[in-house]
Curated annotation (Swiss-Prot):
It catalyses: N(6)-carboxybiotinyl-L-lysyl-[protein] + acetyl-CoA = N(6)-biotinyl-L-lysyl-[protein] + malonyl-CoA. The lineage of its organism: Bacteria, Pseudomonadati, Pseudomonadota, Gammaproteobacteria, Chromatiales. Acetyl-CoA carboxylase is a heterohexamer composed of biotin carboxyl carrier protein (AccB), biotin carboxylase (AccC) and two subunits each of ACCase subunit alpha (AccA) and ACCase subunit beta (AccD). GO terms for biological process: fatty acid biosynthetic process; malonyl-CoA biosynthetic process. This is Acetyl-coenzyme A carboxylase carboxyl transferase subunit alpha. One of its GO terms (cellular component) is acetyl-CoA carboxylase complex. Residues 32-293 form the CoA carboxyltransferase C-terminal domain. InterPro entries: Acetyl_CoA_COase_a_su (IPR001095), ClpP/crotonase-like_dom_sf (IPR029045), COA_CT_C (IPR011763).
Amino acid sequence: MNPDFLDFEQPIAELEAKIEELRYVGDDAEVNIQEEISRLQAKCKSLTESIFSKLSAWQVAQLARHPRRPYTLDYIGRLFTDFEELHGDRAYADDAAIVGGMARFDGQPVVVIGHQKGRDTKEKIRRNFGMPRPEGYRKALRLMRLAERFRLPVFTFIDTPGAYPGVGAEERGQSEAIAMNLQVMAGLRTPVICTVIGEGGSGGALAIGVGDRVMMLQYSTYSVISPEGCASILWKSAERASDAAEALGITSARLKELGLIDTIIPEPLGGAHRNPEQMAGNLHTALAEALQTFSAMDTDALLERRYGRLMGYGEYKEG
């Protein structure tokens, strides 16, 4: 199976394999097979549109985890200039699962922070599979306070299965680190724009996800627990992850419907990994619009709006 394609994409993979085979034959043959290639390409596009028009929540979760999906550093390289990464929380250590630093966005100085997963085994281990420890969140907090001091807008990119639940992380105050970030971000006196680019896993995502605008890429997810974890608790079997994904309402469309996010950023046909440049362009447009909107606001008005947004989540009913 081609690793670029997920199980539900296999009909697409088979068509693309045929196209590649014809191209290979066409290079050596005297006959012109371009017409057949064009026909198959049109069929492939139509099939892809059909499959992606009716994705289940579980299939979206698989896309959000795709191994070739662009990560934070991929977007930083495409959207920002003069990026200078800063390291360490000035208390314990540097956590490579969180990256961040100073950069320029369309020439404007900003602070950018995000989760970072790994591509190969070595990098996955170094990045702890994108699961931050307390020092990662404290590093993010240090950068946000730095941004506030110099009145720099903050961009955060969310892509994590969740905060690391190891014994050492708990001993060093994982829950306190997350809670402190929530508190500080709610009152940060500078624009904060958050984007879920892959997995938005529970408190590990929320710890850099409180802002003036929360956006999601079309095939990203945001939930309190992974579908497998939920299924294991409710039905004692991770095999019912697809049922859990539907029940959790993890997709961007469902979360927008519930009012938990503000904007859905469209992805290229087939997902962000199929055309990272186009995805970066779509993301740039959304970030630029948000930055223009919130940079023009008075600080007190910005904070009042942010507080109102947070207090608008959910509803209270007396029994």
